Amino acid sequence: MSEKIYEYKDENNWFIGKMTGHNLISGWGVKHRTIKKIDDLLDGIAATLDWENPKGYDVSVVRYQSPLSLITFIIDMINQETQREIKVIPHAGTILLMENAKLLAVYLPEGGVSTATFFATSEQGFGDTILIATRNEGKTKEFRNLFGQLGYRVENLNDYPELPEVAETGTTFEENARLKAETISHLTGKMVLADDSGLKVDALGDLPGVWSARFSGPDATDAKNNAKLLHELAMVFDQKKRSAQFHTTLVVAAPNKDSLVVEAEWPGYIATQPKGENGFGYDPVFIVGETGRHAAELEADQKNQLSHRGQAVRKLMEVFPAWQAKQS
């Protein structure tokens, strides 16, 4: 049996675990009935056919907000230790455990969910479809990587060429994200995720902000925007005074539901010249925190763990099941 210590930590959850011969969840902030529900859910999944060397999980909870994060953490431990491929899939307010197209178990929120909501599934199978309110394939790729890990199918507006462009007339990130999500949800009848993201540079009074995509004018491109940003900061030589944050506001809208809003930021600095071949937008000129690395030097999985968008999606996943169940 592995002696590896596993750990997951974010703003709202902190778990430490190892594999033992029995199942145990202990710690702070988790109700006893929640622990029992999760233990019942996972009973038998952690076991193997090797009865002489049974595998169980021993998890200490330091900080807790969501069963989705805790279940995902435990399943990741089990997968790594047993070479299984169990997927954790949020679906209609529930959490499904699936492997090789087989449904193994279902976690229900307090109060359950309606059968109409649960079985309102397309022929493609279990898992929710998210329509991303963008035609930007770079942004869609990031969301697809993030949501794909959680079992979601991702579409974008390129799949719906007949839809009109939604003018981003808001003066805040939330206003713009709401405009896109709620307008497109109304037009399509679908669940829609919209984000408004941008770069806030302290020395420029939080510009380019909501105008990040068109900072260099009506014919803006990533290269033109980066060039203008570097020009605006040309006389700012101290890196500490070139501090900046990538910001994301996510809004999920669905017919006859109150919209869900989450926000996140990614701190760093603006470099004096671009570097790196990955990412898009301002990634080549954004130095990640105190690392000295540019965002465009990160591989997709690294960026998703750190970025404003990755943080926002993880926050969204924490509150999404309860929102979905409450609104159904």
UniProtKB/Swiss-Prot annotation:
GO terms for cellular component: cytosol. Mg(2+) binds at D196. The active site is at D196 (proton acceptor). CDD domains: HAM1. Gene3D superfamilies: 3.90.950.10. Pyrophosphatase that catalyzes the hydrolysis of nucleoside triphosphates to their monophosphate derivatives, with a high preference for the non-canonical purine nucleotides XTP (xanthosine triphosphate), dITP (deoxyinosine triphosphate) and ITP. Seems to function as a house-cleaning enzyme that removes non-canonical purine nucleotides from the nucleotide pool, thus preventing their incorporation into DNA/RNA and avoiding chromosomal lesions. Belongs to the HAM1 NTPase family. This is dITP/XTP pyrophosphatase. It comes from Streptococcus pyogenes serotype M6 (strain ATCC BAA-946 / MGAS10394).
